[in-house]
């Protein structure tokens, strides 16, 4: 096995849409190894758990739900030998480790066990052998935050666990961005190493991949070229698993915004730092229903961003402009957005790639990616009797994990029931 690592990092950017700004994050990763899965290289002897230690409930839970059914270790007591000694890392707290363990089981393991053709056997064959959790992020030399590392399809390290907030599914610090996009992405690599993706996928975006410069690229400009994320534009293998992971974890609003943005042509120009700083506070000036909300999304005419190199850029849709740079309106006061000027409709390219992922999962693993997406998001968001996602009064999807049913307000939430599974093992504890 080689030592190639797959590093997930967050590079921060500030974006401005008209008069509003928002904080966005793009996933940054380095190359993955193509190691084959083989026999266990770890000590597989069983050791009895110490019932007198404080961590006995979680130790028992992960043994019963990770190790025994799937030969998967969930290591939350941070191991220096398994961590990057060049970084000042902090262990995950016991409480946050409990939260992540029950969520990984509920939102990842249980989903694949339910939908894969071989059920539980599928995960025992193909899941990573180790999930290692760390409380803090690691910081890279370019200032980005490392939130995950994957090694050879065997070990996945999830960082920043002490920031876990079950009440936040979306966003830069949401469950999906920090943890579950990583899990689906890396699992996609393992499956791709087992049964290679269709060769037709590798030719769709030939000539557009940039292994060295992808990190400085704008999300929307890359979307217009047919990539779901800038990292997906680094190489075909990453494009493949990013397409899979984004489709599964993006809710309907975010996926629709991505496709809408991808349909248009975009341009990026340098922007003065002083203008950038002057516009930044305006994100917080719109109030809806008494709540402070940022209104920016990718489906707008333009936004500001700060690159990983601390350069300031204006990213905007291509429209006719006058000599002063203002949008040129026609006689009726309208303007026309440019599409397919480069003969690429990013929306159609993304959907073409998704169709190949869909067929590959179905043919090789008997997994319907649309059912997978519905199952994952149906566990994250409240649905009505017809399976439609429910929105709150602000138009946001309702978090199912923390939802309190008005008809049964005294009943525990789903997340409370999940953590109670761990608490049940306290009954088996002893004291010295």
For the regions a language model picked out, list residue spans one by one.
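N-terminal secretory signal peptides that target proteins for export/translocation
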Residues: 1-11
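Auxiliary, metal-adjacent structural segments of Zn-dependent hydrolase domains
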Residues: 98-156
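Second-shell loop/turn segments in exported
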Residues: 86-94, 163-174, 178, 226-234, ...
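C-terminal motif of bacterial Sec signal peptides marking the signal peptidase cleavage site
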Residues: 27-31
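Metalloprotease/metallohydrolase-associated module, dominated by Zn2+-dependent proteases
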Residues: 209-432
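Active-site recognition of the HExxH zinc-binding catalytic motif
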Residues: 170-198, 241
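Acidic/polar, low-complexity intrinsically disordered N-terminal segments immediately downstream
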Residues: 4-6, 32-117, 121-124, 339-432
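Sec-dependent N-terminal signal peptides
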Residues: 9-24
């Amino acid at each position: 096995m080689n030592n190639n690592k797959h590093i997930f990092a967050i590079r921060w950017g500030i974006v401005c849409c008209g008069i509003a700004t928002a904080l966005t994050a793009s996933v940054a990763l380095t190359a993955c190894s193509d190691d084959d899965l083989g026999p266990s290289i770890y000590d597989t002897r069983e050791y009895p758990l110490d019932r007198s230690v404080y961590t006995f409930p979680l130790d028992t839970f992960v043994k019963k739900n990770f190790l025994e059914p799937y030969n998967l270790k969930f290591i939350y007591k941070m191991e220096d030998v398994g961590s990057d000694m060049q970084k000042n890392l902090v262990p995950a707290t016991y409480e946050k480790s409990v939260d992540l363990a029950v969520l990984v089981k509920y939102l990842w393991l249980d989903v694949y066990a339910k939908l894969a053709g071989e059920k539980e056997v599928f995960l025992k064959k193909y899941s990573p052998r180790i999930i290692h959790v760390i409380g803090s992020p690691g910081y890279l030399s370019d200032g980005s935050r490392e939130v995950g590392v994957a090694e050879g399809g065997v070990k996945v390290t999830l960082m920043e666990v002490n920031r876990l907030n079950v009440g936040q599914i979306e966003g830069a610090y949401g469950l999906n961005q920090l943890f579950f996009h990583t899990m689906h992405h890396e699992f996609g690599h393992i499956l791709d190493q087992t049964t290679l993706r269709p060769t037709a996928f590798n030719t769709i975006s030939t000539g557009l991949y940039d292994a060295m410069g992808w990190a400085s690229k704008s999300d929307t400009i890359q979307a217009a070229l047919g990539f779901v994320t800038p990292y997906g534009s680094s190489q075909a293998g990453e494009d493949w698993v990013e397409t899979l992971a984004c489709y599964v974890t993006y809710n309907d609003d975010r996926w629709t915004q991505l496709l809408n943005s991808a349909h248009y042509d975009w341009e990026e120009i340098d922007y003065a730092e002083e203008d950038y700083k002057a516009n930044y506070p305006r994100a917080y000036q719109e109030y809806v229903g008494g709540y402070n909300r940022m209104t920016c999304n990718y489906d707008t005419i333009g936004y500001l961003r700060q690159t990983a190199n601390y350069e300031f850029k204006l990213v905007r849709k291509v429209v006719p402009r006058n000599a002063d740079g203002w949008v040129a309106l026609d006689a009726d006061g309208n303007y026309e957005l440019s599409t397919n000027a480069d003969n690429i409709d990013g929306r159609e390219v993304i959907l073409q790639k998704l169709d190949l992922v869909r067929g590959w999962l179905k043919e090789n693993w008997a997994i319907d990616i649309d059912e997978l997406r519905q199952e994952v998001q149906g566990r994250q968001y409240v649905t009505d009797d017809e399976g439609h996602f429910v929105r709150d009064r602000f138009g946001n999807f309702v978090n199912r994990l923390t939802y309190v049913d008005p008809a049964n307000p005294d009943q525990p939430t789903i997340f409370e029931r999940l953590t109670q599974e761990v608490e049940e093992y306290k009954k088996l504890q002893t004291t010295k």
